[in-house]
C-alpha cells in the first residue's frame, strides 16, 4: 500500500485510487501490455482500461526503480498521473496520448 506524506492531498488521492488495484493480479507486465490499455484510457475514457493501465504502470515503475532506471521510472510516474487525471475527468488530451509513445521509447526493454 502507498504511504501518505502528512498534508499531501495528492498522495491520499493516489492511495484511494490505486489502493484497490494493489491486490489485483498482474500477468505479463510489459510496455507492450501497457501501451494499448493506456491509449484506450486516454482516447476513449474507458474506466476499466484506466484501472488496468494504472496497475501495469505501477508494476513497471517499481521494476524501473529496482533497476535504477530512473528516467524510465519518471516517465512511468508521469503516465500514471495522466491516467489518474483522465479518471478524474481532467485529462490532458493529445499531450497525454503523445506521452504514451515517449514512455514506450524511454522504457524500451523494461
Feature map (PLM): residue ranges:
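Classic N-terminal secretory signal peptides
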Residues: 1-28
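Post-signal/leader-peptide non-cytosolic segments of secretory proteins
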Residues: 27-110
Amino acid at each position: 500500500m502507498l504511504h501518505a506524506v502528512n498534508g499531501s492531498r495528492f498522495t491520499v488521492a493516489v492511495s484511494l485510487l490505486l489502493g484497490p488495484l494493489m491486490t489485483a493480479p498482474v500477468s505479463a507486465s510489459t510496455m507492450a501490455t501497457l501501451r494499448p490499455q493506456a491509449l484506450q484510457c486516454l482516447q476513449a475514457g474507458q474506466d476499466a482500461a484506466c484501472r488496468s493501465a494504472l496497475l501495469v504502470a505501477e508494476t513497471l515503475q517499481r521494476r524501473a526503480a529496482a533497476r535504477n532506471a530512473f528516467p524510465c521510472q519518471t516517465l512511468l510516474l508521469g503516465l500514471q498521473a495522466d491516467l489518474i487525471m483522465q479518471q478524474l475527468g481532467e485529462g490532458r488530451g493529445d499531450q497525454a496520448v503523445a506521452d504514451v509513445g515517449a514512455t514506450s521509447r524511454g522504457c524500451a526493454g523494461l
